[in-house]
Amino acid sequence: MNDLMIDLETMGNKPNAPIVAIGAVFFNPMTGELGPQFYTAVNLASELAAGAVPDGDTINWWLKQSSEARAAITSDEAKPIAEALDALTNFVTRSCEQPKYLKVWGNGAAFDNVILREAYERCSKAPCWNWFNDLDVRTMVNLGRRVGFDPKRDLPFDGERHNALADAVHQAQYVSLIHQRVIPMPDEGSENEPG
């Protein structure tokens, strides 16, 4: 699989926002198959030390979320950002069929992907994907609504909202469902049938 859905939990909404959790799942948008999954909480202090800038409104928003969602981002097992990025890169290297062609999906590409790339830069590390392979969940949602599928209405959420891995899995599922409606897979054997 060469499609990776990422979801970040952050303490801001700008490119320099501190990341507090990274969730990722490989998936095949043509079939909906889910592949290897990745999750880590990120130590907020390490992000601030690296130069990330929190946003008060986002912090206030987090304070209003469920205790489960808050607990996931304040885990004692949270890794320093540099270790979390190394773990993500190692996960991609182990799990991706062709890392050179890895496509990274974010909700949207101007949020998760940009913030994650900025974190790699703050830590003087090379991102694990090429910038030209950023893909946008929001564009797919717009297409889905145009063909009669609204993921917020038509696909129930399974898991804890605002958990980076649960969000990534949900996004991969609805991107796949939309992809299959927009570009249906041919029926097996249809290529061999007389036209």
Where are these regions (language model features)?
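Non-catalytic, well-ordered alpha-helical scaffold segments
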Residues: 82, 86, 113-114, 138, ...
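Acidic, Mg2+-coordinating catalytic module of metal-dependent nucleases/exonucleases
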Residues: 103-110, 114-115, 149-195
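Acidic active-site catalytic centers that drive phospho-/nucleotidyl reactions
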Residues: 7-9, 112, 136, 167
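Residue-level signal for well-ordered alpha-helical scaffold segments within enzymatic catalytic domains
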Residues: 87-90, 94, 114, 118, ...
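A short, structured active-site edge motif that brings together acidic residues
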Residues: 40-42, 128-141
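Conserved non-catalytic scaffold segment of RNase H-like nuclease domains
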Residues: 2-4, 9-106
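Active-site-proximal helix-loop-helix substrate-binding element of RNase H-like nuclease domains
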Residues: 47-49, 54, 58-63, 134-170
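Substrate-recognition/cap helix-loop segment adjacent to the acidic, metal-dependent catalytic center
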Residues: 92, 96, 111-132
